[in-house]
Amino acid sequence: MTSRTDVAQMIDHTLLKPEATPDQVAALAKEAGELGTYSICVSPNQLPVDVPSGVHVATVVGFPSGAVKTEVKAAETGRAVKDGAEEIDMVVNLSQVKSHDYAAVEADIKAVRDAAPAPVIVKVIIESAALDDEEIVATCQAAERAGADFVKTSTGFHPAGGASVHAVKLMAETVEGRLGVKASGGIRDAEAAQAMIDAGATRLGLSSSAAVLEGFEA
């Protein structure tokens, strides 16, 4: 089993409820420092946010539907970077994915990549539970062509569901280590987290980080 410290450094400690208050975000940041998580992930309206030393700041773009114009995603990304975001978790345009217009999917992602140049990290949320296997593979390939750093399973808000071991494994096999793979949505205990890691996840999006980490040995 992966060590607690190693798992903590894979976690984006997440609070994306629209009703989250600044006090709750501050508490999230404090807890991230105590738990030793890699980052916090909060909504862009909460930026800038103070975090303990060693904790990174991630935010979301086009969230949760992805159904906004590409230029809006790019503008949202630029503002988030200006406000201190070190990592951007963007949602693909699912209509384009379902239409199998992968050139458009790639262009949408590339616009965000261009608005968040390295060293900012760009993660692409593909909403894997809403896709078939061919769509998962093709969307991951589009993300790689567009210059993304990670592919990510889910927003956690889609009715189709969150991360699955099958999707994570397929995503990891597709990107073959060239991109990271983030599993998020419905991971609430150590057993589920370890299953995602074993399937190939290199980052975990968790709102229940403390409960998950309790199940790992130090």
UniProtKB/Swiss-Prot annotation:
CDD domains: DeoC (cd00959). It is found in: Cytoplasm. One of its GO terms (molecular function) is deoxyribose-phosphate aldolase activity. InterPro entries: Aldolase_TIM (IPR013785), DeoC (IPR011343), DeoC/FbaB/LacD_aldolase (IPR002915), DeoC_typeI (IPR028581). It catalyses: 2-deoxy-D-ribose 5-phosphate = D-glyceraldehyde 3-phosphate + acetaldehyde. Its EC number is 4.1.2.4. This is Deoxyribose-phosphate aldolase. It comes from Corynebacterium aurimucosum (strain ATCC 700975 / DSM 44827 / CIP 107346 / CN-1). The gene is deoC.
